[in-house]
């Protein structure tokens, strides 16, 4: 065995062994318990970043641990390879997206192998290949035939720079999340999948996901947004149109003082024909921000349409306004406004001088009115009231006025100003007013969802073509199965403006049943590919259909899925939805795709910048920052090599924008893959943010060197004898107890608690004890071998290259990749001694170690031999002894 730990020599050798032996390739085996460990597949951007490394290290640690438990472990990897960045990179590099993508895949694959991840590479897939997306296209046509797919013209967020539609979540402060261009509103035809048909099941089944983070489940519940309410129809004066609104607060209906419609609503469009101000407002709204965060914070604007609706219960005229906070694609494109009980409605009414009518009496309002009418009562005798003084009356009038001059938003009051519905609680008013509306034929109880159908059309090139065609007579049909896959041409020229398949009229031409037809030139949202890849991993070479159900049902559901919480309401919702679609198509038999979700925390690093000549921020890599620290290690001053004074902004997420990413490859070349992996798992709990500190990486490297050194010293002494547990001394038994307690703790930390950092800490603590342990005697060496074999196996999931080599040097049986996880010996963990605190007159004077079965007399005798205790007993008489067996001895002296 070489004396020095040299990762650059051992890691490549071990990786070659895994490749040659196909160590991590698996097949279905009904005789073994399966375990499917999956990390979210990467986008092939060109190079791995530390976020990737953290995600995949967590997955690999779990997969290797489960493998050592004897399970049949599947850990696959692939590439989420379609998407807009490839188009931009292709234009920039004067190439096409396909070669750029495939080159990146090849490079990143080598990086993943360099880190020692135990993937089944035989299952590798790339979502941009026809072999993959052909099944997605076929499935889409089947959904169309089921009525779960439709096309409609829809107002969308349009990025004029990228020439594509953006989801609401991709609009940040009114700008494109990717290129920061101002987003416009545009009406275009798009394809949708009816995720709303599954809204109730998606919501209900969250209750069955016991091992998903509550934060993710809450985010999905809120996104689905189930509500119970009433749909109400209003007639419109001087118009044959009707307005339909939905409200979850029919108890406030008698306080509706205006209606608001979207700028694109037919009634607003009709009114605009003779109203230039309204027409101008509608044009302005075409570019309104529609991301929900923006809707909540933007200035509320509106213009009166000139139309009045008729309140169906009072017959009163209610003005109709066009407002920028109402969207056609949400609900009916019209809302009723109750400014007395809604903050947004109140602000709008105040701004435009619209009536405000309160119809729910708050407890405060009720108390103030009661005091003004009856005076103040005694707490002991509430029927005994004293009239208010002049000052008290003024005070209560002020309080009442202040209360009435703001909207009351709660549901704990009672109705008033509501005619025959006065004096009712929320629930009673809800039911009574709903019943009255239903009786009049203008109301219907409904369950609504905030969730909208999934728009899957994208106006870009680098995506899977949508398999639909249009005949010359306008008939729209799914692409016939014998024409699938609709292959995206890869040998294209990118001009940075239009999609090559939109720019080439010949590509769209086809025939269906002998009739000329045009192919759809939109491509799928890339969330389509990432919504079912996990299932295709179970049978990537299967050619008879989308999935081999036998293989899929053996491996699915995924046992643990690892990825960032930023995917909570997009990918993870579509992921669940697609699984239910596949279930209903008879492809899988489970209801949910993954039993457990682990959301890893972000990786943070120091961020520095200097101010340029034009006031701009120039971000400097932390690698290039020369820093000064105070006595507590805090950065107090920094500059770069050019002498620029740097502003330190603290730790922030590694990103290109702040130039604070750390290249994993550089770290692996400097310290070795095992060191990087160990630091990633030790520096922070898996679900918390990780602060990158190279000093911590150096510490992980030093620890591995200590492990290597101890194994080297042990093996240099020759073969160790067999362990004879019965012949161990007390000290040897104590050390063996520590070994097996560590095995028990690490097993629990990795397997149940998934607190990997505490598992590593426990191994480090044990290593410190082993480093101090004697190795002269035969049983010392036998015990050391048992301990080191356990340590190497416990470290194996974290640092597999070093452990592979150390296992061989220790002459462990077979390869460590097939070795079982160490099992704690319960008998070894039994304590035969205990620590007793000794007090004299209630004050701690010492601690003694005694046998667990020691008598009180033996404990007293042992305490008297303790130097610190003995000096307090000199010349005094012990008058009383208080003994708590195995814990405390208190000697009362006088």
Curated annotation (Swiss-Prot):
Q: Which Gene3D superfamilies match?
A: 2.20.28.290, 3.10.20.590, HUPs, Isoleucyl-tRNA Synthetase, Domain 1, Valyl/Leucyl/Isoleucyl-tRNA synthetase, editing domain
What keywords would UniProt list here?
Answer: Aminoacyl-tRNA synthetase, ATP-binding, Cytoplasm, Ligase, Nucleotide-binding, Protein biosynthesis
GO MF annotation, one: ATP binding
The UniProt record gives the binding positions of ATP as 656
The highest taxon in the source lineage is Bacteria
Q: Which residues form a coiled coil?
A: none
Please, one GO biological process term?
leucyl-tRNA aminoacylation
Please indicate if the UniProt record lists DNA-binding as a keyword. no
Q: Where is this motif: 'KMSKS' region?
A: 653-657
What InterPro entries does UniProt report for this protein, alphabetically? aa-tRNA-synth_I_CS (IPR001412), aa-tRNA-synth_Ia (IPR002300), Leu-tRNA-ligase (IPR002302), Leu_tRNA-synth_edit (IPR025709), M/V/L/I-tRNA-synth_anticd-bd (IPR013155), Methionyl/Leucyl_tRNA_Synth (IPR015413), Rossmann-like_a/b/a_fold (IPR014729), tRNAsynth_Ia_anticodon-bd (IPR009080)
Do you know which SUPFAM superfamilies this protein is assigned to?
A: Anticodon-binding domain of a subclass of class I aminoacyl-tRNA synthetases, Nucleotidylyl transferase, ValRS/IleRS/LeuRS editing domain
Q: Principal place where this protein is found? A: cytoplasm
Q: Per the Swiss-Prot or TrEMBL record, what residue ranges does the short sequence motif 'HIGH' region cover? A: 42-52
Q: What is this protein called?
A: Leucine--tRNA ligase
């Amino acid at each position: 065995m070489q004396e020095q730990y040299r990762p650059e020599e051992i890691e490549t050798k071990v990786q070659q062994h895994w490749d040659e032996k196909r160590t991590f390739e698996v097949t279905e085996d009904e005789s073994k318990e399966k375990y499917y460990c999956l990390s979210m597949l990467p986008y092939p951007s060109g190079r791995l970043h530390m976020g990737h490394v953290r995600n995949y290290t967590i997955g690999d640690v779990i997969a290797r641990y489960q493998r050592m438990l004897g399970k049949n472990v599947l850990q696959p990897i692939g590439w989420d390879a379609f998407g807009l960045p490839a188009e931009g990179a292709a234009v920039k590099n004067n190439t096409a997206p396909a070669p750029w993508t495939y080159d990146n895949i090849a490079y990143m694959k080598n990086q993943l192998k360099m880190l020692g991840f135990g993937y089944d590479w035989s299952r590798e897939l790339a979502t941009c290949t026809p072999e993959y997306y052909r099944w997605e296209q076929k499935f889409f046509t089947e959904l169309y035939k089921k009525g779960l797919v439709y096309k409609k013209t829809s107002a969308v967020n349009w990025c004029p720079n990228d020439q594509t539609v953006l989801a609401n979540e991709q609009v940040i402060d009114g700008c494109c999340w990717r290129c920061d261009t101002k987003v416009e509103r545009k009406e275009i035809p798009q394809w949708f999948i009816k995720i709303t048909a599954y809204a109730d099941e998606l919501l209900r089944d969250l209750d069955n996901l016991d091992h998903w983070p509550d934060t993710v489940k809450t985010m999905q519940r809120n996104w689905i947004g189930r509500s119970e309410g009433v749909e109400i129809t209003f007639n419109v004066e001087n118009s044959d149109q009707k307005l339909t609104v939905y409200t979850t607060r029919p108890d406030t209906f008698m306080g509706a003082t205006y209606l608001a419609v979207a700028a694109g609503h037919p009634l607003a469009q009709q009114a605009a024909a003779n109203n230039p101000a309204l027409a101008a407002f509608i044009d302005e709204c075409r570019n309104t921000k529609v991301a929900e965060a923006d809707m909540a914070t933007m200035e509320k604007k509106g213009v009166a349409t000139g139309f009045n609706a008729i309140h169906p219960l009072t017959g009163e005229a209610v003005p109709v306004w066009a407002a920028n906070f109402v969207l056609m694609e949400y609900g009916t494109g019209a809302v009723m406004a109750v400014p007395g009980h809604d903050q947004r409605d109140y602000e709008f009414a105040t701004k435009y001088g619209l009536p405000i009518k309160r119809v729910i009496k708050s407890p405060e309002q009720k108390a103030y009115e009661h005091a003004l009418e009856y005076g103040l009562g005694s707490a002991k005798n509430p029927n005994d009231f004293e009239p208010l003084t002049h000052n008290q009356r003024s005070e209560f009038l002020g309080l009442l006025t202040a209360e009435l001059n703001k909207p009351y938003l709660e549901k704990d009051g009672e109705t008033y100003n509501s005619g025959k519905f006065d004096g009712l609680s929320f629930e009673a008013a809800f039911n009574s007013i709903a019943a009255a509306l239903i009786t009049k034929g203008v109301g219907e109880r409904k369950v609504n969802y905030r969730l909208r159908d999934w728009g899957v059309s994208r106006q870009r090139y680098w995506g899977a073509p949508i398999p639909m065609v249009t005949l010359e007579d306008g008939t729209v049909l799914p692409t016939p199965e014998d024409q699938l896959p609709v292959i995206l041409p890869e040998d294209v020229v990118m001009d940075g403006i239009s999609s090559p398949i939109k720019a080439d009229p010949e590509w769209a031409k086809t025939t269906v049943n002998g009739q000329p037809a045009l192919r759809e030139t939109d491509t799928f949202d890339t969330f389509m590919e990432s919504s079912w890849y996990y299932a295709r991993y179970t049978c990537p070479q299967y050619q008879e259909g989308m999935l081999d159900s036998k293989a899929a049902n053996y491996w699915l559901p995924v046992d643990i899925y690892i990825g960032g919480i930023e995917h909570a309401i997009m990918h993870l919702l579509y992921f669940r939805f697609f699984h239910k679609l596949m279930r209903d198509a008879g492809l899988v038999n489970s209801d949910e795709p993954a039993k457990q979700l682990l959301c890893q925390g972000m990786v943070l690093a120091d961020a520095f910048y200097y101010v340029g000549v034009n006031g701009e921020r120039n971000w400097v890599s932390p690698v290039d920052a020369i820093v000064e620290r105070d006595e507590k290690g805090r950065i107090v001053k920094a500059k770069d090599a050019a002498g620029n004074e740097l502003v330190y902004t603290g730790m922030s997420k590694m990103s290109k924008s702040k130039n604070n990413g750390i290249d994993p490859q550089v770290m692996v070349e400097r310290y070795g893959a095992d060191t990087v992996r160990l630091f990633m798992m030790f520096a922070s709990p898996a679900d918390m943010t990780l602060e990158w500190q190279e000093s911590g990486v150096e510490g992980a490297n030093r620890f591995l060197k200590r492990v290597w050194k101890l194994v080297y010293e042990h093996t240099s002494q020759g073969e160790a004898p067999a362990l004879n547990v019965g012949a161990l001394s007390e000290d040897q038994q104590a050390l063996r107890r520590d070994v097996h307690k560590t095995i028990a703790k690490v097993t629990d930390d990795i397997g149940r608690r998934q607190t990997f950092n505490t598992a590593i800490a426990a191994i480090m603590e044990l290593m410190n004890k082993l480093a101090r342990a004697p190795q002269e005697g035969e049983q010392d060496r036998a015990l050391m071998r048992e301990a080191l074999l356990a340590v190497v196996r416990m470290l194996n999931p974290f640092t597999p290259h070093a452990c592979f080599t150390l296992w061989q040097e220790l002459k462990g049986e077979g390869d460590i990749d097939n070795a079982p996880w160490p099992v704690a010996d319960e008998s070894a963990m039994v304590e035969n001694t205990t620590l007793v605190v000794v007090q004299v007159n209630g004050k701690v004077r010492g601690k003694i170690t005694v046998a667990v079965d020691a008598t009180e007399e033996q404990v007293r005798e042992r305490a008297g031999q303790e130097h610190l205790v003995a000096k307090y007993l000199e010349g005094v008489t012990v008058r009383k002894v208080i003994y708590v067996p195995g814990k405390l001895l208190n000697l009362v002296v006088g």
